C-alpha cells in the first residue's frame, strides 16, 4: 500500500477502544443492544466499546453488583488481521495488523509483530519477536531471525520501504533500516545494522554492516531453508 493511503485511512478511521466486560447482578431489563452479549439475567459477558460500557455502568450501577473489564486497545485506528484468511502457520502471540499480505506456507512465530501494509512472501519465516514495519516487502523463502527489526516507513510518507528479495537470511537481532534493499540470496549476520543496499549473494556483518564475503557452498549449507517447517498438513 502507498504510505499516503495508509495515513489517510488511519486519520479518517473511527478510533476504537474495544473491551470485554464480565458483569454480575440483576441484568433483567438492561438493554445490551450496543454490545455482543452472552449470558442470562444474573451473569453476562459483553464485547463492545468502552464508552458504551461506561454509559451502561452509569445508568445501571444499582443493578450491577460487580464487573471485570479487559481493555484490548485505546483509540485504535486499525484492527488486527483475520488470521483465518491466511494459508500460513501463525503461532500464538503473533501480532498482525489488518491489510498485511502473507504468502502460502509462510511461518509467523510467537511474538512476531507485522505492521500494516507489509508483504510476507511464500514460505518465509518470521521468527520469534521479530518486527516487520509498515510497508516492508519480504520475498519468498526468507528467514527473518529472532528479534530482528525490518524498519517500517509510514512516516515520513516519502520514504522508500525496505525490500528484502527472495531467499535472504537475516540473523537474530539484525536491523534493516528504511529504504534498504537486500538482494536475493544474501545473508545478514546476527546483530548487524544495515544502512545501505546489500548486493545479491553476499554476506554482510557489523555496525554498520559491510560485505565480508560472497556466498559460498559452506554458507549455503549453513543457511539452508527447511521446507518441512513450512508444511501445513
Curated annotation (Swiss-Prot):
Pathway: Amino-acid biosynthesis; L-lysine biosynthesis via DAP pathway; LL-2,6-diaminopimelate from (S)-tetrahydrodipicolinate (acetylase route): step 1/3. GO terms for biological process: diaminopimelate biosynthetic process; lysine biosynthetic process via diaminopimelate. It catalyses: (S)-2,3,4,5-tetrahydrodipicolinate + acetyl-CoA + H2O = L-2-acetamido-6-oxoheptanedioate + CoA. GO terms for molecular function: tetrahydrodipicolinate N-acetyltransferase activity. Belongs to the transferase hexapeptide repeat family. DapH subfamily. Its EC number is 2.3.1.89. InterPro entries: DapH, DapH_N, Hexapep, Hexapep_transf_CS, Trans_hexapeptide_repeat, Trimer_LpxA-like_sf. The keyword RNA-binding does not apply. Keywords: Acyltransferase, Amino-acid biosynthesis, Diaminopimelate biosynthesis, Lysine biosynthesis, Repeat, Transferase. SUPFAM superfamilies: Trimeric LpxA-like enzymes (SSF51161). The keyword Repeat applies. The gene is dapH. Catalyzes the transfer of an acetyl group from acetyl-CoA to tetrahydrodipicolinate. This is 2,3,4,5-tetrahydropyridine-2,6-dicarboxylate N-acetyltransferase. PANTHER family: 2,3,4,5-TETRAHYDROPYRIDINE-2,6-DICARBOXYLATE N-ACETYLTRANSFERASE (PTHR43300:SF10), ACETYLTRANSFERASE (PTHR43300).
